[in-house]
Design a protein with these regions (language model features):
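Flexible loop/hinge segments that line or gate small-molecule binding clefts
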Residues: 110-150, 161, 168, 263-271, ...
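N-terminal export leaders
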Residues: 3-7
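Hinge/cleft segment of the Venus flytrap/periplasmic-binding protein
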Residues: 29-36, 41, 176-180, 195-198, ...
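Short, solvent-exposed amphipathic alpha-helices that sit
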Residues: 56-70, 151-155, 179-199, 213, ...
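Extracytoplasmic "Venus flytrap"
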Residues: 44-71, 76-92, 100, 106-110, ...
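Hydrophobic alpha-helical segments within soluble ligand-binding/sensing domains
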Residues: 88, 143-169, 213-215, 262-266, ...
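Bacterial signal peptide processing site
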Residues: 22-26
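Hydrophobic alpha-helical
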Residues: 105-121, 188, 203, 207-269
Length: 343
């Protein structure tokens, strides 16, 4: 698509979908002026979560929009209402037609999305993944919130601590196809086999990234496994869902609850002693870093083979051999520290 046609299309988009960066060029254009000949091209970056209604990704979007305020870019934001790999592919196809400069996407299905992303690359569009990766040949860089090994081992070690290294536990995940969560589960199970012979993983249930379904699945698990000592929830809606199930069953404290989630969604359960630990990273920083990497790639500041990238307020971060930029180590939120955080 020609740039002039693309810009006319963007002008017609709803304001909720197009978030312009604040800069003099934009002001001139809004006043009826035009970009001066020879001025740098303004990048359009398309940003897609796994699902728009998930509080985790709402906070990712918040961080992305913070980066927009620092960068001379336009941001397109869209994604499925619920986790839907087919819808992600459809949105990518639309962005290919629009001719965006960079696509940044959290992949629901690692292999299922790779074809659409490869097509984007063939059309000259740069691709960055974040939170959950695709196949390496379908993107340039992956913005990783933490290593899969670090997350999986951290969850398993915390569950073992809470259960005094013995007893049955169950996992609630988002879907059985989520590539990042499958990676975490692999390391959870490896750590279990390596270090905790008196603990047993009895079941793994998907909740489709829905709190209500997570609550129902946790209720079912409590009924099916009367000796259950811990529910480990590895997607953000599942943590409060599992906590509510344990609370309503009158098993707070007897059945431990931990998982990956937002402190804001779990504060009450932590302070009541229903949930013992919430593990996460600073989610807004993940969205912020993703936009910084996408901008660096689209502008040419970041190239294949680079070992570091400048990431605004986060400073310079390392890039590993798998072309992954690591945000940092996970953090454990407890009733003692949860009030220090507002996301």
């Amino acid at each position: 698509m020609k740039r002039s046609h693309f810009l006319r299309f963007l002008t017609a988009l709803p304001a909720a979908l197009l978030v312009p960066g604040c800069n003099k060029t934009e002001t001139d254009q809004e006043a009826g002026g035009s970009t001066a000949p020879g001025s740098p091209k303004k990048l359009t970056i398309a940003f897609m979560p796994k699902s728009k209604g998930n509080s985790y990704f709402i906070n990712c979007e918040k961080g992305a929009r913070e980066a927009v305020q620092e960068l001379d870019i336009d941001l397109l934001f869209d994604g499925p209402t619920n986790t839907d790999p087919a819808k992600q592919n459809e949105i990518i196809e639309n962005w290919i037609t629009l001719g965006v400069d960079v696509i940044a996407v959290a992949c629901e299905n690692k292999e299922g999305i790779s074809g659409a992303l490869k097509k984007a690359i063939e059309k000259g569009i740069q691709v960055v993944t974040f939170d959950s990766d695709t196949t390496p040949d379908a993107r340039s860089f992956f913005v990783n919130q933490a290593t899969g090994q670090g997350i999986g081992e951290g969850l398993m070690d915390e569950a073992a601590r809470l259960c005094e290294e013995e007893g049955e536990f169950a996992i609630i995940t988002a879907t059985l196809t989520a590539s990042n969560m499958n990676e975490w589960r692999k390391h959870i199970e490896a750590r279990l086999a390596e270090k905790y012979p008196r603990m047993k993983l009895v079941d793994t249930k998907p909740c489709d990234d829905q709190k209500d379904k997570a609550q129902q699945e946790a209720t079912n698990l409590l009924g099916a496994y009367p000796n259950l000592k811990c529910v480990m929830a590895i997607c953000s809606p599942a943590v409060p869902g599992a906590a509510e199930a344990v609370k309503q069953a009158g098993k707070a404290g007897a059945v431990k609850v931990l998982g990956l989630g937002l402190p804001s969604e779990n504060r009450a359960y932590l302070k009541e002693g229903v949930t013992q630990s919430v593990i996460l990273w600073k989610v807004t920083e993940l969205g912020y870093l993703t936009l910084q990497v996408a901008h660096a790639l689209g502008s040419g500041a970041l190239k294949a083979g680079d070992t570091h990238v400048k990431a605004g307020r986060l400073g310079e971060l390392a890039i590993d051999a798998n072309r992954a930029v690591l945000l940092g180590k996970p953090f454990v939120f407890t009733k003692e520290n949860v009030d220090q955080f507002d996301f």
